C-alpha cells in the first residue's frame, strides 16, 4: 500500500485543529524580541494571514520594549524596570507612544496588508478602547493598570473582516492626559478576556518558562506559578507574562501559551500540531483544557 506523502500527511494531521479553531478568536502578543529580523517578521505575517484563510480570527497586540529602550538611550532619557514593568516618566511616555503607535503599529499593519490581510492598526487610546489608571498609585509614573477594554468595538472590527493590530497605550480619565504605557503582556491578557478568546499566545525570545536547570516547563497552573515565583524560578520580565496567562485562563480564556517567537512559524506549530511548543497554562478544573489531569499531577509530584 502506497504511503501518504509526508507533506499531505502533515495537512491531514492538522485537520482536527482546523476544525477546532474555526471561527474562534486567538489573541497574539507579538513581542519586540520576536520582531528582530525581517525574515521572522515575514513568517509571522504569513502565519497571521493563514489563520484568517482558515476562518480563525486573530487579534495582534504588540510590544516594542527593545526599540523604546534604544530610543530613550539615544535621547538620554533615563529608564528603569521594577518586576518587569517599565517606570515611565512624562518624557518617556512621549517616546513610548511615538514608537508603539506611530512606528511599530503601522509597520505591522502594513506588513500584514502586504501579505493580503485586511489589518487595521489602532492605539488603545482610539475611541477609548483601553482605559487605565496609574499603576500602584503612580509608583510607576505613566505606566498604567487597565480598568476597561472596549471588546465590543474590537469585535465590530473583526466582524467587518479586519485584523485588529493594537498598540498598548491607554487613555486616562483627565482631559489632555498624555496617556498610559501599558505592559503589552497585560494588554494582551485583558483584551483576550474582553473578547472571551479561545487562546492567548505570547511570542517571546525564550522557548517558554524554564526551570532552574534551564529545561522547558511544558504545563503550568496557578499553584505551580505561585511556587515558582516564590523560589525565584520565575522572575523579572517573565513575571508579567505568567501573571497575565494565569489571569486570562481564570477569566474566560480557555488556554494561554508562552512560545518562542524566534522559531519560524511558531504560531502554526503551537496551534496545528499535537505536541505544540512552549509552555501552556491551564486551569486544572477546566474540563475543556484537553489535559489528562491525573497524569499532569503525577508528573508534578
Curated annotation (Swiss-Prot):
CDD domains the record matches: AAK_NAGK-C
Gene3D superfamilies: Acetylglutamate kinase-like
Pathway info: Amino-acid biosynthesis; L-arginine biosynthesis; N(2)-acetyl-L-ornithine from L-glutamate: step 2/4
GO terms under cellular component: cytoplasm
Main EC class the enzyme belongs to: transferase
Database matches in Pfam families: AA_kinase
Keyword Manganese among record annotations: no
HAMAP family found in the cross-reference section: ArgB
Described function: Catalyzes the ATP-dependent phosphorylation of N-acetyl-L-glutamate.
Protein name: Acetylglutamate kinase
Amino acid at each position: 500500500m502506497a504511503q501518504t506523502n509526508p507533506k499531505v500527511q502533515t495537512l491531514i494531521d492538522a485537520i482536527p485543529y482546523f476544525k477546532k479553531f474555526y471561527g474562534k478568536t486567538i489573541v497574539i502578543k507579538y513581542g519586540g524580541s520576536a520582531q528582530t529580523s525581517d525574515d521572522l517578521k515575514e513568517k509571522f505575517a504569513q502565519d497571521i494571514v493563514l489563520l484568517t484563510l482558515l476562518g480563525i480570527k486573530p487579534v495582534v497586540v504588540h510590544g516594542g520594549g527593545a526599540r523604546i529602550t534604544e530610543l530613550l538611550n539615544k535621547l538620554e532619557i533615563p529608564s528603569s524596570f521594577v518586576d518587569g514593568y517599565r517606570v515611565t516618566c512624562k518624557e518617556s511616555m512621549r517616546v513610548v507612544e511615538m514608537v508603539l503607535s506611530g512606528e511599530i503599529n503601522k509597520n505591522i499593519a502594513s506588513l500584514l496588508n502586504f501579505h493580503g490581510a485586511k489589518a487595521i492598526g489602532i492605539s488603545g487610546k482610539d475611541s477609548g478602547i483601553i482605559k487605565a489608571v496609574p499603576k500602584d498609585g503612580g509608583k510607576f509614573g505613566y505606566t498604567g493598570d487597565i480598568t476597561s477594554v472596549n471588546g465590543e468595538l474590537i469585535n465590530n472590527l473583526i466582524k467587518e473582516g479586519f485584523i485588529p493590530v493594537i498598540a498598548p497605550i491607554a487613555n486616562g480619565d483627565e482631559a489632555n492626559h498624555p496617556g498610559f504605557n501599558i505592559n503589552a503582556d497585560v494588554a494582551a491578557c485583558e483584551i483576550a478576556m474582553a473578547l472571551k478568546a479561545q487562546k492567548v499566545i505570547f511570542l517571546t525570545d525564550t522557548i517558554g518558562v524554564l526551570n532552574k536547570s534551564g529545561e522547558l516547563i511544558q504545563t503550568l497552573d496557578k499553584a505551580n506559578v505561585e511556587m515558582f515565583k516564590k523560589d525565584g524560578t520565575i522572575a523579572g520580565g517573565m513575571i508579567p507574562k505568567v501573571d497575565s496567562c494565569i489571569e486570562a485562563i481564570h477569566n474566560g480564556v480557555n488556554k494561554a501559551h508562552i512560545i518562542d517567537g524566534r522559531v519560524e512559524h511558531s504560531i502554526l506549530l503551537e496551534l496545528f500540531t499535537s505536541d505544540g511548543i512552549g509552555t501552556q497554562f491551564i486551569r486544572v478544573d477546566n474540563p475543556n483544557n484537553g489535559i489528562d489531569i491525573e497524569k499532569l499531577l503525577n508528573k508534578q509530584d
